[in-house]
Amino acid sequence: MNKHIITEISPLSEKDCLFIVERYKTEFTYPLHNHKEYELNFVENGAGVRRIVGDSVEEIGDYDLVLLCGDNLEHVWEQGNCQSKQIREITIQFSPDLFSNNFIDKKQFTSIRKMLDRAQKGLSFPLHAVMKVYSTIDSFLKV
């Protein structure tokens, strides 16, 4: 693993609530990095890719969906044992400020607040949950 960690500067501006990018790739080459933004990262056709989030190292299946909410949480997806040449990745970044002014503290958002808290060290969703939100993630690309 690369010992050098870059601090990513997101293209997310103060006037944006989301930054969404879709990439098709033959391999993962982006280095170990961190950033202050929250991130939802989706990978398709990635069986064998090695996901590193903080001190967690896992080999993923064909689909992967991870929520990262830790301030400057180090993370990277590496090629690992992946043989696919048609990897799809969708990254959605949003500012922690999106939940400012006690908005997230309202009782109706208790489950969301708990999920964001659990994602401080990275939260990987099970396959059945990924499949439930697959079309929703696709629809974000049309925004």
Task: State what each model feature region is.
Residues K142-V143:
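An accessory alpha-helical subdomain
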Residues N2-L12, C69-S139:
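A hydrophobic/aromatic-rich effector-binding and dimerization subdomain
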Residues M1-L67, D71-L73:
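Generic protein-terminus/edge-of-domain signal
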